[in-house]
């Protein structure tokens, strides 16, 4: 657990106003319950939901990619965690080895809105409903969400980083 992030025994003896203000204004936010109030990218755990979206949209055992260790889109290079690449990767191997390049390429085939739709069905971007006070909702980004939130278009690179649980996905 991450809460509290300080020795709460200091309050038993009493603390000064100076100590209180230092803790309250601490960059690490020691009074924040990071489990229910922290927003963090999910990382590779999202790949199971993205894999379900792939299956729903025709990407399965018959889909193979060559992972060279990175994918270039425009002037941007999106790296796989395995910099030397995985070589030829099918659906099952991509999941077993968490091949980023497979998820990048699959996400480009089906698009962010289909991925977002599947993740919606799984409850991503919503509160858990476990009755925690002040629980924050995460974000399940898509084209409409970005246009509404930032008044900007969705870029292809955002699709690939979302497929591995990074970017606007909190």
Question: What function would you assign to each model-found segment?
Answer:
Residues 1-44, 49-170:
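Beta-lactam-recognizing serine transpeptidase/beta-lactamase-like catalytic domain environment
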């Amino acid at each position: 657990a991450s809460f509290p992030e300080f020795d709460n025994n200091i309050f038993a003896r009493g603390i000064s106003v100076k100590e209180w203000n230092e803790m309250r204004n601490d960059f690490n936010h020691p009074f924040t319950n990071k489990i229910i109030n922290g927003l963090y990218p999910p990382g590779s755990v999202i790949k199971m939901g993205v894999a379900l979206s792939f299956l729903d949209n025709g990407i399965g055992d018959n889909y193979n990619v060559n992972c060279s260790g990175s994918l270039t889109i425009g002037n941007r290079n999106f790296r796989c965690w395995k910099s030397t690449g995985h070589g030829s990767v099918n659906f099952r191997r991509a999941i077993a080895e968490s091949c980023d390049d497979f998820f990048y390429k699959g996400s480009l085939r089906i698009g962010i809105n289909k991925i977002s739709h599947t993740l919606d069905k799984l409850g991503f971007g919503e509160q858990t409903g476990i009755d925690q006070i002040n629980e924050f909702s995460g974000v399940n980004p898509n084209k409409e969400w970005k246009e509404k939130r930032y008044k900007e278009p969705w870029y292809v690179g955002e699709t690939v980083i979302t497929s591995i649980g990074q970017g606007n996905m909190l």
